[in-house]
Amino acid sequence: MKLKEVTEGKVRIFVPDPKEYMIEGKFDPSWAPVFYNPKMTFNRDLSVIVVSLLKPKIILDALSATGIRGIRYYVESWKSEQLILNDKNSTAASLIQINVKNNGIENAKIYNKDANALLYEIKSEYIDIDPFGSPVPFILSSVNATIRNGIVAFTATDLSPLEGSSRTSCRRKYDAINYKLSSSKELGLRILIGKIIREAATLEKTVHPLFSFYADYYYRLFAIVESGARKADENINKNLKYFGECPRCGFQTFVDENCKTKCPICGENFIIIGPLYIGPLHNMEFLKRMIDTYSDFNYLSSFNRIQKLLNVIEKEAKYKSVFYNISKLASKLKVSAIPPIDSILECLGDASKTHFAPTGIRTDKGYEEIIRCVKSLR
């Protein structure tokens, strides 16, 4: 395997040389013997900031590939007492050894095991699950391996089922009914969190989002793991419901499982999806700490993008409602000229943009008020 040295953040690692694995002039990271995707640098950059605030004693990266994520945590975030890196690919495990040594890390434990098998053997304060595709196969084992009040982090790149494009796949993987709706970018994240909560409950545990976001082609979630059947039951009863959208007028709301399914505005039957998580997507105290801290990481290649994301999330996080997609709402209302988002925000007064969609707004004001602004500004 021919290697190439790359720099990401403050570390230098060896990765398979992309030139050796091109097909007809194109390269996909999955074609190489060991997976390394430079397009996920933004994900790793933000994760470095999160881990720097958590300062876990033990960090476990269960699907390490080149080891880049765990190595960056140790070098840039926090020199944990123990760094555990694992990959079931023996070629990857050997490359991790090289990269750990190349970055002067002496206390790393490197495993060449199936991720689930390893997770049922050891416990950790921070566990990272960054798979190629869905994290579902690793939910039970990773939540089980996370100590009380520890953190588990998931990346999900299978947006097709989560956003409703592949309904049968969503039912199979996430045990949720799904359709492609106006706010599916956010609803997909909520379906993912809902699935994790239900899986954790079988272990008499539960999870609460610490920080989460959508970017490019994936969701990223950092969640606090709590123990206790009562806490698991409380979270399910309070924060797992369904979501309804009216296909005629665009009205949307969270609904109970056995509620009436007709739109209160126009009487059309709702399109119902779920179950999904309806609670806050971020811990506000932790979000404030992130905003107060991220400037310390101005060396990151995606620093400006991180700044923009956090600025938007800070504003939208206070609203409880799912965002409205103004472009799609205007289409349902037969409004040909979509008003500028900034004008709608000014009209509403108490509202914000959302990081989920450029034409989305988030507000706790009623549907009628949103419609009034959209129509008055056309």
From Swiss-Prot:
Q: Which InterPro entries match?
A: SAM-dependent_MTases_sf, Trm1, TRM1_arc_bac, tRNA_met_Trm1_C
Q: What class of enzyme is it?
A: transferase
Q: Which GO terms describe its biological process?
A: tRNA N2-guanine methylation
Instruction: Provide the E.C. number(s) assigned to this enzyme.
Output: 2.1.1.216
Keyword list (alphabetical) reads: Metal-binding, Methyltransferase, RNA-binding, S-adenosyl-L-methionine, Transferase, tRNA processing, tRNA-binding, Zinc
Detail which positions bind S-adenosyl-L-methionine: 44, 69, 87, 114-115
Under SUPFAM superfamilies, the record lists: S-adenosyl-L-methionine-dependent methyltransferases
NCBIfam families named among the record's database cross-references: PRK04338.1-7 (NF003331), TRM1 (TIGR00308)
Q: What is this protein called?
A: tRNA (guanine(26)-N(2))-dimethyltransferase
Phylogenetic classification of the source organism? Archaea, Thermoproteota, Thermoprotei, Sulfolobales, Sulfolobaceae
Name of the gene encoding the protein in the UniProt record:
trm1
